[in-house]
């Protein structure tokens, strides 16, 4: 009896995934790249050749792309340590809502190799990139002024500098000069 119940559980998650891919007409190859797995893995999940993933990272990535909560998958176990969603992630999600962009539309705007990184940013597992070009690409895709995302990039860089031993109180002049220069660059190149 337990085996029958397990197959119903697998079928439900597999069906959810299959229905999502059909509804959005998202190619399985694109989906695989977005969540950082192989195409054969996606086919195996849908065909139930393998059990649906119980790995929280994979389930969170799948849920992020599907715009659902990972808890909707019965296989998902809530992690002991809660995932903290930072202000930047919330900012990006708000902009997606304002622009009426789905997660899939947003992800398709990025190069294929970068999509799984963006999924990790949206699920709160990765901060925005320190590479300004990558961060400014997010602003371009969201069609917002780069100054709006710059604030989040600056906060991320300050946090990294502090964690690396930079004392902003003792080096306020240098810190102010660094970020004044960066702000000027962003304003001139917007």
Where are the regions that the model predicts?
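A short, Lys/Arg-rich alpha-helix, primarily the initiator
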Residues: 1-27, 78-105, 157
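The short coil/loop that forms the "turn" connecting the two helices of the helix-turn-helix
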Residues: 26, 37, 68, 101, ...
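Key DNA-contact positions within bacterial/archaeal DNA-binding proteins
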Residues: 29, 40, 71, 116, ...
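Recognition helix of helix-turn-helix/homeodomain-like DNA-binding domains
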Residues: 36-53, 76-78, 112-128
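DNA major-groove recognition helix of helix-turn-helix
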Residues: 46-47, 58, 66, 74-77, ...
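Short, basic-rich loop-to-helix N-cap that marks the start of a DNA-contacting helix
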Residues: 49-64, 125-140
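Short C-terminal boundary/hinge segments that cap the last helix of small helical domains
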Residues: 67-83, 140-160
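Interfacial/linker helices and their anchor residues that mediate assembly or domain coupling
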Residues: 83-109, 140, 153-190
């Amino acid at each position: 009896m337990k085996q029958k119940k397990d197959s119903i559980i697998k079928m439900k998650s597999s069906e959810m995934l299959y229905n999502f891919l059909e509804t959005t007409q998202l190619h399985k190859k694109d989906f695989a790249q977005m969540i950082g797995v192989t195409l054969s893995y996606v086919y195996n999940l849908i065909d139930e050749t393998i059990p649906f993933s119980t790995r929280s990272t994979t389930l969170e990535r799948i849920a992020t792309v599907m715009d659902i909560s990972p808890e909707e998958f019965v296989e998902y176990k809530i992690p002991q340590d809660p995932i903290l969603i930072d202000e930047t992630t919330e900012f990006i999600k708000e902009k997606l809502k304002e622009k009426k962009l789905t997660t899939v539309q947003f992800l398709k705007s990025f190069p294929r190799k970068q999509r799984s990184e963006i999924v990790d940013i949206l699920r709160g597992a990765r901060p925005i990139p320190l590479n300004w070009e990558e961060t400014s690409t997010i602003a371009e895709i969201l069609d917002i002024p780069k100054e709006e995302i710059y604030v989040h990039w600056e906060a991320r860089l300050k946090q990294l500098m502090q964690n690396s031993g930079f004392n902003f109180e003792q080096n306020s002049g240098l810190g102010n000069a660094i970020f004044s220069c960066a702000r000027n660059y962003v304003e001139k190149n917007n």
